[in-house]
A protein has these predicted regions:
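Short S/T/G/P-rich N-terminal loop/turn motif that feeds into the first structured element of a domain
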Residues: 1-48, 52-66, 72-89
Length: 89
């Protein structure tokens, strides 16, 4: 399993959730298994998307991020990705 994290800056982070919800079918069709979005401050959110493997993530992530930024009016201010080492709960 592989995870991608994207840090977003936007006026109202809750509005970004609406964009993500609209885009979820397309993201899922690209191979995503799940996505979580966390509000990290008044103008920021972090998304975590789980993928079956690194190759699937890399094929999809750049276009999905660009579409998300264009639709939400948000700006990507950081990102990270890597192989999932463990999952609990």
């Amino acid at each position: 399993m592989f995870a991608t994290f994207t840090d977003w800056s936007m006026d109202v982070p809750e509005e970004g959730v609406k964009t993500a919800e609209e885009m979820w079918p397309e993201i899922q069709a690209a191979g995503a298994l799940s996505m979580r979005i966390v509000k990290i401050d008044d103008t920021g959110a972090r998304s975590m998307t789980m993928w079956p493997d690194e190759e699937t993530a890399h094929k999809a992530i750049h276009s999905m991020r660009a579409k998300g930024a264009a639709k939400s009016g948000g700006e990507i201010i950081g990102s990270a990705m890597g192989t999932v080492l463990a999952e609990f709960g």
